[in-house]
């Protein structure tokens, strides 16, 4: 069976076409895994201005619909048997989301789903655990997106991953870049404002997710993978090198400061930096480093590193169709 999955977030829209492959272990137990056929991303900034206006901008809708048309063609060419389209933070917050949903349905011929933060967290967790291996009940996955960040505590692997508790908060690289007019280089005052918003968000997470019990941290999404590329000193973006890499708290903090201190032009010249992330990476890495710093404090030093996963909600969307 060939599965199609589309994740439409605040900053990007991504497509995964994968084959469901059944494998049998030495004990005769069958498991189903995904084998990638196509994996693509377009930066469309759907959430442009949503934090301030509460509406999806027409130019943002146009960019997203254009990418959706490309994906519709790829799904047709590769013969996907099932397709699921999931929209997250920006669409949840938008007063004109029906315009978006009607447009997507017309282009793709399927009904898009605007999922809750809770379901977003669950799908992110399932996708991340596919890549980092079976963990214990104290694995914390955080998915730092454009408009929101999901914190998920749980254990298990792939489709069997189980969420113990989760919380979605409205802190993301696009949202805070716009809210605090984050520049390049990022000023000390802007860092303080972004960190203050992040701290406030984490306080709301603690009320529903026992972060102090976490023994392992896993980070997913573009901010985390881009920082990993920088920390590894990659000349170009390399998914295989990034996936599963472990970074110390000190490395994350140091690399975040390096990226914050760069001008827009310096960031744009980095071989691993997607053009659509140049303007939002400063706020993104500030949020990322602050989350890991607070996790280190909350767990009394137990969490002092983070594992980076290339697999996230997009894989979770695909796994949900098995």
Over which residues does each language-model region extend?
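Gly/Thr-rich phosphate-binding beta-strand-loop-beta motif of the actin/hexokinase/Hsp70
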Residues: 1-33, 128, 134-166, 220-228
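Short, charged N-terminal helix-start/capping segments
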Residues: 1-21, 38, 43, 49-53, ...
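Short glycine-rich, Thr/Ser-proximal phosphate-binding strand/loop in the N-terminal lobe
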Residues: 11-59, 157-190
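Helical "lid/coupling" subdomains associated with nucleotide-phosphate turnover
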Residues: 49-77, 90-138, 165-322
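Surface-exposed, interaction-prone regions with an acidic/low-complexity signature
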Residues: 83
């Amino acid at each position: 069976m060939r599965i199609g999955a589309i994740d439409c977030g605040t900053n990007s829209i991504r497509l995964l076409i994968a084959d469901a492959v059944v494998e049998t272990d030495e004990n005769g137990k069958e498991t189903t895994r995904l084998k990638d056929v196509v994996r693509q991303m377009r930066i469309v900034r759907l959430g442009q201005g949503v934090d301030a206006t509460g509406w999806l901008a027409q130019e943002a809708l146009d960019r997203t619909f254009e990418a959706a048309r490309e994906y519709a063609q790829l799904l047709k060419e590769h013969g996907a048997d099932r397709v699921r389209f999931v929209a997250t933070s920006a669409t949840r917050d938008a007063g004109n989301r029906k315009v978006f949903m009607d447009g997507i349905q017309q282009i793709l011929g399927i009904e898009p789903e605007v999922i809750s933060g809770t379901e977003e967290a669950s799908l992110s967790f399932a996708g991340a655990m596919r890549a980092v291996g079976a963990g214990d009940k104290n694995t914390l996955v955080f998915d730092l997106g454009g408009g929101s960040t999901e914190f998920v505590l749980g254990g298990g692997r792939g489709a069997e991953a189980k969420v113990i508790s989760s919380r979605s908060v409205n802190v993301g690289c696009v949202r805070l870049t716009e809210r605090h007019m984050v520049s390049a280089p990022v000023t000390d005052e802007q860092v303080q404002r972004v960190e203050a918003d992040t701290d406030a968000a984490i306080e709301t997470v603690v009320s529903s997710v026992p972060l102090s019990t976490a023994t392992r941290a896993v980070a997913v999404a573009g901010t985390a993978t881009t920082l990993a590329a920088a920390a590894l000193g990659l000349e170009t973006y390399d998914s295989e090198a990034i996936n599963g890499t472990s970074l110390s708290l000190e490395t994350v903090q140091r690399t975040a400061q390096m990226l914050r201190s760069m001008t827009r032009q310096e960031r744009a010249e980095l071989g691993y930096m997607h053009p659509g992330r140049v303007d939002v990476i400063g706020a993104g890495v500030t949020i990322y480093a602050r989350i890991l710093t607070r996790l280190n404090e909350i767990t009394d030093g137990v969490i002092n590193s983070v594992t980076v996963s290339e697999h996230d909600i997009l894989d979770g969307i695909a796994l949900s169709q098995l």
